[in-house]
Amino acid sequence: MTSFKSLLAACGLSALIGLAAPPSHAGSTVYPLTLENCGTQVTIKKAPERAIGFGQNSAEILLLLGLQDKMVGTAFWPSKVLPQLAEANARVKLLTVEMPTFESMLAENPDFVAVALPSLVGPNSKIAKREDFDKVGVSTYLSPSTCLSTKNVKDQYGSRGELWNMDLLYKEIDELSQIFDVADRGQALIADFKAREAKLRGSVAKDGQNLSYVFWFSSPSPSADAYVGGKNSASGFIADLLGGHNAIAAEAEWPTVGWEGIIAANPDVIVVASLDRNRWELDKPEAKINFLNTDPAVSQMPAVKNKALVVMDGQAMNPTIRTIYGAEQVAEQLKALGLLK
């Protein structure tokens, strides 16, 4: 059995194994535990024993908390599990890498479902709504990072009026650790992420310049508009964390922007997503970089001519635990290019 200490070591958190006494609120959970979660009051009567991680980020947080033996399934994996979590993940039943059915989840007799995205259990979900789980006595918890989108924008992915930050992720880790009565583990993970975030905050451009970034997730084809990280998205957070800013001004979470608009934005750095899926022609980073270097107009952009092109895990462009890993990937490559100290 994989212990929490061995999991910490595998994730590079071994320095936290010997942490001093955790904060006072990291003691045993008192049940029933009631939380306000994305506009819904959730009451947990006891620590879940048969949880499902519905969506990659939710599943990976549960695994990071060492809860694999309290999980009966996972579903909806846009990319492969973090390598350091592979052993723990192998102990949990994979329902499907795509969208499960409500019936397939209920077949595992779950008592709790951690959900990564509002669309998975929202009013327009084709799988199930939160109230459907409530009716059968299954508690749900939705990632706080994904439930703040405004409702007055037509973009199907919603928008953000303020820059996303890690506090929402820390809240998610803290609340999930309370739900499962492992608050000490939650505090250890949060402490690690905060230390890594603080280290990245020290990154500055070598010439003191405020670098501008475009984060390109994918495009259906070379002639199609690009899906890019919006101004206040996790991508915008990464740019800010590294002392720069997002060149995309749209508040939509995932705006589609034509290449004429990207050329006009004139970013100093283009970050291309690495995706495991093969849905679109430009999903793979190699295809993106080839397009950037061969398109007659795009190849003339200063960022392309200066080879200021870096590759990042596409999941890091979503507001997830991957975001900090992605920021570290970008920082390492920019330092190698001489753009960051």
Give short role names for the model-derived ranges.
Residues 35-39, 92-103, 251-259:
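Short helix-initiation/N-cap motifs at beta->coil->alpha
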Residues 53-123:
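A short, structured surface patch at a secondary-structure boundary
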Residues 163-172, 271-341:
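Structured C-terminal subdomain patch of bacterial secreted/periplasmic proteins
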Residues 19-60, 162, 178-216, 335-341:
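Bacterial Sec-exported substrate-binding components of ABC uptake systems
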Residues 119-128, 138-175, 206-234:
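Extracytoplasmic ligand-binding site segments that recognize negatively charged/polar headgroups
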Residues 10-18:
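Bacterial N-terminal signal peptides
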